[in-house]
UniProtKB/Swiss-Prot annotation:
Ligates lysine onto the cytidine present at position 34 of the AUA codon-specific tRNA(Ile) that contains the anticodon CAU, in an ATP-dependent manner. Cytidine is converted to lysidine, thus changing the amino acid specificity of the tRNA from methionine to isoleucine. Belongs to the tRNA(Ile)-lysidine synthase family. Its EC number is 6.3.4.19. It comes from Halalkalibacterium halodurans (strain ATCC BAA-125 / DSM 18197 / FERM 7344 / JCM 9153 / C-125). GO terms for molecular function: ATP binding; tRNA(Ile)-lysidine synthase activity. This is tRNA(Ile)-lysidine synthase. Pfam families: ATP_bind_3 (PF01171), TilS (PF09179), TilS_C (PF11734).
Length: 462
């Protein structure tokens, strides 16, 4: 393993300039092995090493892990810094999940520490198995085509370079190294929780791939590196092409010439859309997957002016004659729509939320749409409206507030008021399409109701 890592560092010239390296250390096997390895080879690599531990304060073992890392550094004479990161408080404010919030806080703190101490590098313990997981997860989610690959070997953040020296080795090699140098790392039990997507990939898919080819991580590494190089080249071309079709650009509005855009090759068109979204979402786009880019492409090709598409976080794409506009909604609070609409029975009904199609069933449900539910004749007339304070859904046991349903499903605040609630004639909520159906509906097979949302953002949550 040692020579593999040294060869990887030399091949990618990770520490060519030398200087202080801040190693992100959780106390787990990956980061502890990286800390030990870099400190042991510091003279050969021409670097100085400092350990940085971010205490997320989420588990009882958190303080014990911080003490463990600190004591390890004291016993080896390694520089050490730590901080208590307010993950829970930030989650309550942002509504983001624990992993996303912890990662954002951790990296911001590491970057601040690097600036404070004049560090040239931040090193993390990501390894070859992590690379396989990341690439496969991106492919499954539909975000791989326009990404720059998997986990980058290096990434610039201001004046600091984030580097991953272990991307060329496996988790098994790291575990073996820990035993070899007598490191007994701490283990985070959440790494075994099947509720996290990455863990399901790690414990189910990675062993299968390893069984097929023990060196698969090397091939995935090349895939990521080649993809990054290819994508950088294509994005440069797309930037030049975008400059030629751009009519207006500021933080609230981007306008392009439709005809000029359509004269560009399709691969560059997709990347031009990607660049616009990246700009408007300030590099952190929730709308750069297959579904959003393809829907924007369809809108641009549509011959009907006035067509609109709603994206997450208040961005609207619209065709206005010969122009395509990306518009960011103002920060002003919009009135909550109520829109009570009655559905009497079979047929199609258009609402401000989208279209509802009701058909009578003869031989079981027909639609596979997640926005479909069934009901009986006694449920009609149905009423469709937006949420109101106090609305509740019925569960198998007890009830739940609709507001809590949206929180549990991680639906953004601005989208919640655009989501229809469907009531039966007894004023019970029979469906929040895509998120909830009344427990009794599975026994009611007289009619099938399919909702087609007008706002495509709803599809991101089902």
């Amino acid at each position: 393993m040692k020579q593999d890592v040294l060869n990887f560092i030399e091949e990618h010239r990770l520490f060519a300039s030398g200087g202080l390296v801040i190693v992100a250390v959780s106390g787990g096997p990956d980061s502890m092995a990286l800390l030990h390895f870099l400190f042991s080879h510091r003279e050969q690599l021409g670097i100085t090493v400092m350990a940085a531990h971010g205490n997320h304060q989420l588990r009882q073992e958190a303080d014990e892990e911080e003490t463990f890392v600190h004591q390890f550094c004291l016993s080896h004479g390694i520089l050490f810094t730590s901080a208590r990161l307010p993950v829970k408080e930030r989650m309550e404010m942002s509504g983001e999940g624990v992993q996303v919030t912890a990662r954002e806080l951790r990296y911001k703190w590491l970057e601040a520490e690097a600036k404070k101490h004049g560090a040239a590098f931040i090193a993390t313990g990501h390894h070859g198995d992590d690379q396989i997981e990341t690439i496969l997860m991106k492919q499954v989610r539909g975000t791989f085509p326009l990404s720059r690959g998997g986990i980058p070997v290096r990434r610039e953040v201001g004046d600091v370079l984030i580097v991953r020296p272990f991307l060329g080795i496996t988790k098994g090699q790291i575990e073996h190294y820990c035993k070899e140098v007598n490191i007994e790392p701490k283990r985070d039990p959440s790494n075994n929780a099947s509720s996290y997507t990455r863990n399901r990939f790690r414990h189910t898919i990675i062993p299968f791939i390893r069984g097929e080819n023990p060196n698969a991580h090397l091939h995935f590494r090349r895939i990521s590196e080649w993809k990054e190089e290819d994508e950088c080249f294509l994005l440069d071309l797309a930037e030049n092409a975008l400059a030629d079709v751009l009519l207006h650009k500021d933080e609230h509005l981007v306008t392009i010439d439709r005809d000029a855009f359509l004269n560009v090759g399709l691969p560059l068109q997709r990347r031009m859309i990607h660049l616009i979204l990246k700009y408007l979402y300030t590099n952190d786009s929730p709308a750069n997957g297959f579904i959003h880019i393809e829907r924007i492409e369809t809108l641009i090709r549509n011959d009907v002016t006035g067509t609109k598409l709603h994206l997450p976080m208040g961005i609207t794409v619209e065709r206005v004659y010969g122009q395509i506009r990306w518009v960011r909604a103002s920060g002003e609070k919009q009135p909550v729509p109520v829109y009570p609409v009655v559905i009497e029975g079979e047929g199609q009904v258009s609402t401000p939320f989208g279209r509802f199609c009701v058909v009578q069933l003869v031989s079981g449900p027909r639609s596979m749409s997640p926005f479909t539910f069934t009901c009986s004749a006694s449920d009609f007339p149905l009423t469709v409206r937006s949420r109101r304070t106090g609305d509740r859904i019925v569960l198998s046991v007890g009830t739940k507030k609709v507001s809590r349903l949206f929180i549990d499903k991680k639906v953004e605040r601005e989208v919640r008021d655009r989501w229809p609630l469907v009531f039966n004639q007894s004023s019970e909520i029979v469906s929040v399409p895509g998120l909830y159906n009344h427990p009794s509906q599975k026994h009611k097979q007289d009619f099938q109701v399919t909702f087609t949302p007008k706002d495509v953002r709803l599809e991101d949550y089902v």
